[in-house]
UniProtKB/Swiss-Prot annotation:
Coiled coil: none annotated. Residues 3-280 form the DegV domain. PANTHER family: DEGV DOMAIN-CONTAINING PROTEIN DR_1986-RELATED, FATTY ACID-BINDING PROTEIN TM_1468. The keyword Transport does not apply. Hexadecanoate binds at residues 63, 91. The keyword Transmembrane helix does not apply. Disruption phenotype: No effect on export of cell wall protein GspB. Keywords: Lipid-binding. This is DegV domain-containing protein. Transmembrane segments: none annotated. Disulfide bonds: none annotated. May bind long-chain fatty acids, such as palmitate, and may play a role in lipid transport or fatty acid metabolism.
Length: 281
């Protein structure tokens, strides 16, 4: 039995450490258009250059989801396939994956495919992808993994801290009124992915220190009790370190990873932004 874990650019991993036996990890990239230039969000993407060009251009930049054909290519060569996409509320990637699943099963009826709408992005997607690899490593069957990952997803959440939201507003991913408030000097948006996968405002924090304490306050309020955290961030090592210290004061055994955002997550989180996936319960 061979396995594949497939994710789009909502996932920040470009490779998975300790990949399970007989398992491959495939990334299906979204694209980002800056002016007339198209950036493909794969391992070769120079994210710093893309961001530099984005801030230098006066025209609105935008992202585009993978086609069903992109997913079909990624499916090839495995008996069991798990797909994790960025929230379907904000991107057509999930729909493309579902279309590809239908087409692929018509040609390969003996293959198992499970498509997961993360209803999220960044760190929470990373947690789901990492968990799939662990479940495959544990020797579970396809159906058992479907059950386990569904249960696990109900115990993960996304918290984000953003100093800039221009791209989210311009691309219709965030309310303009919220965008106007966050656009004020030194105001950061502390929010979450809601139950339907939309971006919801929790707090408007004035200044760095208040955003740090607000983020910690919100994960505790949501039910965090020392589980794993993955912080995907755009050039914000300082926040990651200080937030980790804050968490470990209360939960010394907490596992916390900090990883750079993908091209897509960098595009939407912008400079200094964080997309934090965490376990609750």
């Amino acid at each position: 039995m061979t396995w594949k874990i497939v994710s789009d650019s909502g996932c920040d991993f470009r490779e998975l450490k300790d990949l399970a036996l007989d398992t491959n990890f495939e990334n299906v990239p979204l694209t980002i258009q800056v002016g007339q230039e198209i950036f493909i969000d794969n391992a070769e993407l120079n994210i710093d250059l893309m961001m530099e060009k984005m801030y230098a251009t006066s025209t609105a930049s935008k992202s585009a989801c993978p086609s069903p054909d992109d997913y079909l290519k990624a499916f090839a060569g495995a008996d069991n396939i798990f797909v994790v996409t960025i929230t379907g509320t904000l991107s057509g990637s999930h729909n493309s994956a579902q279309v590809a699943k239908k087409l692929y099963l018509e040609e390969h009826p003996n293959v198992n495919i499970h498509v997961i709408d993360s209803l999220s992005a960044g760190g929470e997607v990373d947690l789901l992808v990492q968990k799939l690899n662990q479940l495959i490593s544990n020797g579970l069957s396809f159906d058992e993994i479907v059950q386990e990952i569904t249960n696990y997803q109900s115990k993960t959440k996304l918290l984000f801290v953003l100093a800039k939201v221009d791209n989210l507003v311009k691309n219709g991913r965030l309310n303009k009124l919220i965008g106007a408030v966050v656009g004020l000097p030194n105001i950061r948006m502390v929010g979450e992915a809601g139950p339907q996968g939309t971006l919801e405002l929790l707090q408007k924090a004035r200044g760095y220190k208040k955003s740090l304490s607000a983020a910690f306050e919100e994960i505790i309020k949501a039910g965090y009790a020392g589980g794993e955290i993955i912080i995907s961030h755009r050039n914000n090592d300082k926040f990651c370190q200080q937030f980790s210290d804050l968490v470990k004061e209360k939960f010394p055994n907490a596992q916390i990873q900090a990883i750079p955002t993908s091209g897509l997550c960098s595009f939407y989180a912008e400079e200094g932004g964080l997309l934090m996936g965490y376990e609750i319960g």
